[in-house]
């Protein structure tokens, strides 16, 4: 093969790689992971079985207190029944294909995981007796990211439209959660706060000093809130059990 032929093949491979990474690969990865885990739980006792859920990493306060802190993250990828899985998967797909392109792959992944972790920490703090699972804490984190984008990019009509639509959806979900005891409202609010804080901390690549200070402040706020919620959850769980 000639040098020109090699260069042409290398160029084509580079373009294929670029096209691949333009796709919402993180969103697809998260969707695939939660589907695989759901199928495994279905085979291994059922996704609505409490013992199966706990075995696969659902949030369960006594085990968190015992040191299984990874349970702040694993519940994000577990779902209780087909309806729960389908609803959250549709929302993740719809939000993911928009936000991952806007924020970038690693920022999107970080916001999704960290906001979910803060949401589960809030659930740990205020729902001591519940076994909980689901992507809702992270999805509310993505809602928080849309609010941040709407506040930041005031001159972008597409982002403003998206922020208004999701702002309405957030309000409806919070009101519904307030009147429905089966909804983990604390987890949703914690995820929403986490998404907004982390979006401010990591999603603006702006070198201006005012943004640098704001990013540090909001990042520190996230860390303080996480520690506070974990402390509340720890001592409340010890008292309850």
Task: Label the model's feature ranges.
Residues 104-114, 134-139, 159-166, 216:
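Cytoplasmic-side transmembrane-helix entry/capping segments in multi-pass membrane proteins
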Residues 23-133, 181-183:
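N-terminal TM1-TM2 helical hairpin plus the immediately adjacent luminal interfacial "cap"
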Residues 1-22, 174-241:
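C-terminal transmembrane module of polytopic alpha-helical membrane proteins
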Residues 38-45, 123, 127, 149, ...:
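Structural signal for membrane-spanning alpha-helices in multi-pass inner-membrane proteins
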Residues 35, 113-117, 138, 143, ...:
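Residue-level signature of the transmembrane alpha-helical core
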Residues 100-103, 154-160, 205-214:
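Membrane-interface helix-boundary motifs at transmembrane edges
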Residues 27-32, 109-113, 166-167, 171, ...:
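Hydrophobic alpha-helical transmembrane segments
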């Amino acid at each position: 093969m000639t040098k020109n032929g090699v260069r042409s093949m290398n160029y084509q491979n580079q373009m294929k790689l670029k096209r691949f990474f333009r796709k919402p690969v993180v969103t697809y990865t998260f969707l695939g992971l939660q589907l695989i885990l759901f199928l495994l739980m279905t085979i291994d006792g059922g996704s609505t079985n409490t013992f199966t859920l706990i075995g696969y990493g659902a949030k369960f306060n006594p085990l968190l207190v015992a040191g299984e802190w990874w349970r702040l993250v694993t519940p994000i990828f577990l779902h209780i029944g087909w309806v729960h899985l389908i609803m959250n998967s549709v929302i993740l797909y719809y939000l993911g294909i928009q936000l991952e392109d806007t924020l970038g792959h690693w920022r999107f992944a970080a916001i999704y995981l960290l906001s979910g972790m803060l949401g589960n920490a809030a659930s740990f703090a205020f729902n001591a007796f519940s076994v909980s699972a689901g992507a809702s804490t992270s999805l509310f984190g993505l809602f928080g990211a849309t609010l941040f984008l709407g506040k930041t990019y005031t001159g972008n009509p597409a982002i403003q439209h998206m922020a208004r639509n999701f702002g309405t959806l957030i309000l409806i979900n919070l009101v519904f959660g307030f009147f429905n005891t089966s909804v983990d409202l604390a987890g949703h609010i914690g995820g929403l706060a986490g998404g907004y804080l982390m979006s401010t901390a990591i999603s603006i690549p702006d070198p201006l000093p005012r943004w640098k200070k704001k990013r540090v402040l909001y990042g520190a706020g996230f860390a303080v809130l996480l520690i506070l919620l974990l402390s509340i959850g720890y001592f409340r769980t010890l008292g309850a059990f």
